[in-house]
Swiss-Prot record:
Subcellular location: Cytoplasm
GO function terms (MF aspect): alanine-tRNA ligase activity; aminoacyl-tRNA deacylase activity; ATP binding; tRNA binding; zinc ion binding
Chief location of this protein within or outside the cell: cytoplasm
Family: Belongs to the class-II aminoacyl-tRNA synthetase family.
Free-text comment on the cofactor: Binds 1 zinc ion per subunit.
One annotated GO biological process: alanyl-tRNA aminoacylation
Database matches in InterPro entries: aa-tRNA-synth_II/BPL/LPL, Ala-tRNA-lgiase_IIc, Ala-tRNA-ligase_IIc_anticod-bd, Ala-tRNA-synth_IIc_core, Ala-tRNA-synth_IIc_N, Ala-tRNA_lgiase_arc, Ala-tRNA_ligase, Thr/Ala-tRNA-synth_IIc_edit
Protein name stated in the entry: Alanine--tRNA ligase
Classification lineage: Archaea, Thermoproteota, Candidatus Korarchaeia, Candidatus Korarchaeales, Candidatus Korarchaeaceae
Entry keywords, A to Z: Aminoacyl-tRNA synthetase, ATP-binding, Cytoplasm, Ligase, Metal-binding, Nucleotide-binding, Protein biosynthesis, RNA-binding, tRNA-binding, Zinc
Keyword Oxidoreductase belongs to the record: no
The EC number(s) this enzyme carries: 6.1.1.7
Cited function: Catalyzes the attachment of alanine to tRNA(Ala) in a two-step reaction: alanine is first activated by ATP to form Ala-AMP and then transferred to the acceptor end of tRNA(Ala). Also edits incorrectly charged Ser-tRNA(Ala) and Gly-tRNA(Ala) via its editing domain.
Cofactor: Zn(2+)
């Protein structure tokens, strides 16, 4: 890819040079030797405020500038990239238009257009804070895009640069001699092209990409559509204009100081902060693998303070910066439908949450993370994003739940880490990644338990890089497509009339032993809906059709029995009971999904579905279990929709038109890789891109009964249901069971509720009495064990094996029953391990340290533990308990 020749810049007197520091080519108007970008040159804009504008004002100035120059303003897309098979998060404005618009397959929503797109990018997450605002995990990419096709030329390189130049000089007020244009190559989302990066004051404030290639097998292939792909950093431009000490001061303003007060962090002297921020450009070297400690040392030398003083004053503020950024990102992600989990975009949300909790822990703050995330939603809802206000309750609940889950992970972590340490001796980076990926244990927790562990400065970036993109499932390739192409595509009668169950068709031929017809009403397997079955009849012969499958534009029919010859006309019958049941269940799936979204919240998304004849299932994303009351409301709403007998329409729409009309909830069933979408709309209630067969009105579904809601994996709930006649049959069976139970109990059906409540109360009392008796028996057992002590040196040692009560209850009893100086070891089997408690009863401090003794000995045995001088708690593998007790006796003899 060659350099860029820009006639506009030549005409303004710019010349092309090569930077002696970074080796990159750039365009400059004056006698400049370097490219002007940090770290080749330091930041010069800090302390030189040009305009005291807010983020909202800068955004509006930009959009209005381009509107006045023929661009159509369009609304932002979600930060969760539901329309992409290869990405989880919207990381740039061009992501909104890839791959179909950039490939010229579908038209853009406007051409040219302008947008300010919130983006989430986690590849630099460990640099957020230390680089003072240069790196952010959430930012707004202001952009203007033009899509040049063979039929329509909009503008290209010169006009793009001219538009930036005019905006920079007339709106931002930057003298043109202060602007340099640095050349580069951009790649992203499967596309590439040369770019220019305008630099001013040491800061890159935009990227102008001339996308003209698609990347295939590592090679650049020219595109039919040439795309102007620009990105103007809203936060960077605001920082540049205001000249504030850091980008966080410019972006967050009063909210920054509010967070500092909440978190107990004082702002350092602003002159020190400004000087550090100016030289913080050297932290770009983090990208080359240098450690933050070595760069901090260099920065301290440059501004004339000690490394210790700089660390003490700057590090807490950097932590506040990180929390500001992360909680804003979380509020947008959750508002746009993210549910934290261990997979996909949910994993990335959880990564942000756990990194934030780690930072709060380092600060020693007890402020709930949920409080900070909610405050961000409140703040930004009044700054151009009113949709965040509707999500405040959900943000608070989700983050609170995740905080509790993190605490649980930490509590479980000691054993996991101890086991791994025993196996490996010293933990590697791969071990740290595994502990985080599989168990949610951050390096800080690992270090707390395992001691000295080498943690890379970019640990969370390494984690994010593994999960930020996904490889789409490769389409199943039918190996005999060349044979199929010899025949005309199959006419799909099931789309013309889903109730067509009998038809005539001509046999065109066979591929792979499967029949090709000129037309068919047999629905092929796809989208969670099984294929139709039925029969073919010709010349008095009848054979079974046991399946149908679609490859490209052709339907192949699997037939059992004699095969009619090519050219024969067959009479086909689709199994009506199966077809109609599947139609009802498929439309019911759409109804239940929308009902769940309306009851539980807009974060609910279809994870998977399977439509059956008697029973179907729908898997949805949700951050906690579904209560019986919520399930009842979902079921009631679904049946109300059935009773309203709403029309179900099928439309074929160009992708961009469908997205404009219905939004991205179209893709509940997954991304549909087609330029024209088949949209199934339950009028005024729900619309989805869907290729399945459906009823024409919701009343045809019949009753909907949801039988079960259960968690099948982290963040996913499975709803199992029946519709129509199968639902009625299940209800009848259910009622019969109630009758049978009532008859067995000798009561009426109406008395069942009262009868079983009484039984449960009685059972509760019996269990309570049983626990009391077991406790008394255990107390007597402990008393006997304490009487039968053994002497170990100058100590009395009593060993108590607990049977029916837990270790904590045993500690209370042992402490109460010990009347003299006694070392008491309590053991309680738990799976393949034994829980331990070591008590030094009636000892004075400094005589025996039970906590230290238990911790030391249990670690030697592959366990772990700790405590204070009076009490230690821990565990060891069951097969090493006797060894533990033997070593304990020897140690006590020496104390």
């Amino acid at each position: 890819m060659q350099g860029i020749e820009v006639e506009f810049l030549r005409s303004r007197g710019y010349v092309r040079k090569r930077c002696p520091k970074c080796g990159e080519y750039f365009w400059t108007l004056k006698d400049r030797e370097t490219c002007g970008e940090a770290p080749c040159e330091p930041y010069t804009f800090i302390g030189r405020g040009r305009q005291n504008k807010s983020l909202e004002e800068v955004r509006e100035d930009f959009l209005r500038f381009f509107e006045r120059r023929g661009h159509t303003r369009i609304n932002r897309y979600p930060v969760i990239a539901r329309w992409r098979e290869d990405l989880f998060l919207t990381s740039a404005s061009i992501v909104d238009f890839q791959p179909f618009i950039t490939a010229g397959i579908v038209p853009p929503p406007a051409n040219p257009l302008t947008i300010s797109q919130p983006c989430i990018r986690l590849k630099d997450i460990d640099k957020v804070g230390p680089t003072m605002g240069r790196h952010l995990s959430i930012f707004e990419m202001m952009a203007h895009h033009a899509f040049n096709t063979k039929d329509k030329f909009v503008y290209w390189i010169d006009r793009t640069v001219e538009l930036f130049h005019e905006y920079a000089t007339s709106v931002l007020g930057i003298p043109e001699e202060e602007i340099t244009y640095k050349e580069g190559i951009w790649e992203g989302g499967g596309n590439a092209g040369p770019d220019l990066e305008p630099i001013a004051g040491g800061l890159e404030i935009a990227t102008l990409v001339f996308m003209q290639y698609r990347i295939e097998n590592g090679s650049y292939v020219p595109m039919d559509t040439r795309v102007v792909d620009t990105g103007y950093g809203l936060e960077r431009i605001t920082w540049f204009l205001r000249g504030d000490p850091t980008g966080f001061h410019a972006v967050y303003g009063a909210l920054l100081h509010e967070f500092m007060d909440k978190l107990g962090v004082s702002e350092p002297d602003l002159s020190l902060l400004s000087e550090y921020s100016k030289v913080s450009s050297i932290l770009r070297e983090l990208e080359k693998g240098r450690s933050i400690s070595s760069l901090r040392r260099e920065a301290a030398l440059l501004i004339g303070v000690s490394e210790e003083e700089l660390e003490e004053k700057i590090a807490p503020l950097e932590a506040v910066f990180s929390l500001l950024d992360h909680t804003k990102a979380l509020s947008f992600m959750i508002a746009d439908g993210l549910v934290p989990s261990n997979v996909n975009e949910g994993y990335l949300g959880r990564l942000l949450i756990r990194r934030s909790l780690r930072i709060l822990n380092q600060l020693g703050s007890e402020v709930p993370l949920s409080e900070l995330a909610v405050r961000q939603a409140e703040y930004w809802s009044s700054k151009g994003f009113p949709e965040l206000r509707e999500a405040i309750d959900r943000i608070a609940e989700i983050v609170s739940i995740e905080e509790e889950r993190y605490k649980e992970a930490v509590e479980r972590g000691a054993k996991i880490i101890s086991d791994l340490m025993r196996e490996k001796g010293r933990l590697s980076v791969d071990d740290l990644i595994m502990l985080y990926d599989s168990h949610g244990l951050s390096p800080d927790i690992v270090r707390r338990i395992a001691g000295d562990v080498d943690v890379p400065d970019n640990f969370f970036e390494m984690i994010a890089a593994r999960h930020e993109a996904r490889k789409p499932e490769p389409p199943k390739v039918f190996e005999r497509m060349d044979e199929l192409r010899r025949y005309p595509p199959t006419k799909l009668l099931y789309y013309q009339d889903p109730y067509l169950l009998e038809f005539e068709a001509r046999v065109l031929g066979y591929v792979d032993g499967k029949m090709i017809l000129d037309r068919t009403a047999f629905y092929p397997e796809g989208g969670g809906q099984p294929s139709d079955i039925g029969s073919f009849e010709w010349r008095g012969i009848e054979v079974k059709v046991v399946g149908a499958e679609k490859h490209g534009g052709w339907i192949l029919h699997s037939v059992e029995g004699d095969l009619p010859p090519a050219g024969e006309v067959v009479r086909a019958r689709v199994d009506s009971w199966r077809r109609l049941n599947r139609m009802r269940h498929h439309t019911a799936t759409h109804v239940i999904l929308e009902a769940a979204r309306r009851v539980l919240g807009s974060h609910v998304w279809q994870w998977g579905a399977q439509k059956g004849d008697e029973e179907s299932r729908l898997d949805i994303t949700h951050y906690k279990g579904i209560s019986q009351e919520e399930l009842r409301r979902i079921e009631m709403l679904a049946n109300e929709v059935v009773m309203r007998n709403i029309p179900v329409r099928t439309l074929w729409l160009v992708r961009t038109d469908a997205e404009r009309r219905y939004g991205f909830t179209l893709y509940q069933g997954g991304v549909v890789p087609d330029p024209v979408l088949r949209v199934v709309e339950i009028e005024g209630f729900n619309a989805q891109a869907c290729g399945g067969t459906h009823v024409l009105r919701t009343g045809e579904i019949g009753p909907i009964k949801i039988w079960r809601a259960r968690k099948i994996q982290d963040g996913v709930i499975r709803l199992e249901f029946s519709a129509g006649v199968p639902a009625v049959k299940r209800i009848i069976d259910y009622h019969q069971k109630i009758k049978d139970i009532a008859q067995s109990a000798g009561i009426s059906e109406e008395e069942i509720d009262t009868f079983f409540r009484g039984m449960m109360e009685e059972l509760k009392e019996l269990r309570k009495e049983r626990r009391r008796m077991m406790k008394e028996a255990e107390e007597r057992s402990i008393e006997r064990a304490l009487e039968a002590y053994e002497s170990t040196g100058r100590h009395k040692l009593s060993i108590v094996r607990l049977e029916s009560i837990g270790i904590d209850e045993g500690i209370k009893l042992a402490d109460k029953l010990s009347s003299d100086r006694r070392i008491v070891l309590l053991t309680k089997e738990s799976g393949d391990r034994v829980e331990l408690a070591l008590l030094a009863t009636n000892y004075g401090e400094g005589e025996v340290d039970a906590g230290s003794l238990l911790r030391e000995l249990s670690r030697e045995m592959g366990g772990g533990g700790g405590g204070n001088w009076k009490l230690g708690k821990g565990s060891v593998p069951k097969d090493r308990l006797d060894e533990f007790m033997g070593v304990l006796r020897k140690r006590l003899e020496g104390i």
